[in-house]
Amino acid sequence: MIALVGAGLSKESGIPTFRGGDGLWDKHGEPPMDGYQRFLEDPAAWWAQRLAEQEKTSEFSKAIEEAKPNAGHVAMAEMERAGLLKHIITQNIDDLHQQAGSAAITEIHGNRTKQRCIECSRRWPREEFVSGEVPPRCPDCDGLVKNDTVMFGEPIPQDALESCFREARRADAVLLVGTSAVVYPAAEFPVIAYRQGARLIEVNPQETPLSEICSAVLRAPSGEALPRLLERTRGLVAGS
């Protein structure tokens, strides 16, 4: 079994979502959709602005810095340790799966704690990458370095995309956790698995476009449903 995780799981840790009635975009408006193009056109200016604004704290950045893994994150880490969950594909950038103890993770939208070379995809923990250049360059290939978070207009890193397709094709079940299943390419992965015979299990208080093809649906927050699912699955394994 693998999992596709969306913003609903992070919301339970106090991180606001972008979409939806109480999302940040409804309150503050959508950000520019050409962020990556702006970065490519003048990376030095982009980095200069980023460094100048790094002391400012937005609602989202404050929430994400203060967030802790919730019961859903912990249950998924326990599922991995028990051999029940083989891989997590997450759309979240908050690093909470790692903090909870999960190891087999593909972060399709990047990780806020890392920097990444846009040429060779090498990644570094944010605090370990030190460069006197603006914009910073990769020590391996001299490519431009930016934060690992995928910007609007930026292609999903190829290594992450390949990992997602590989895991989807070999999954026998997909756990859909707090994802609206409307953002592509992420919403495509469970469909690929389903067409190859995998069962889909949805954990979401709300109905999604994938609900009708799910074998099981748990209409509850992840922090409530996943610990119960973990215990139920452990019981079935122990009794088999």
Task: List the model feature ranges, each with a label.
Residues 1-240:
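Conserved catalytic core of sirtuin-type NAD+-dependent deacylases
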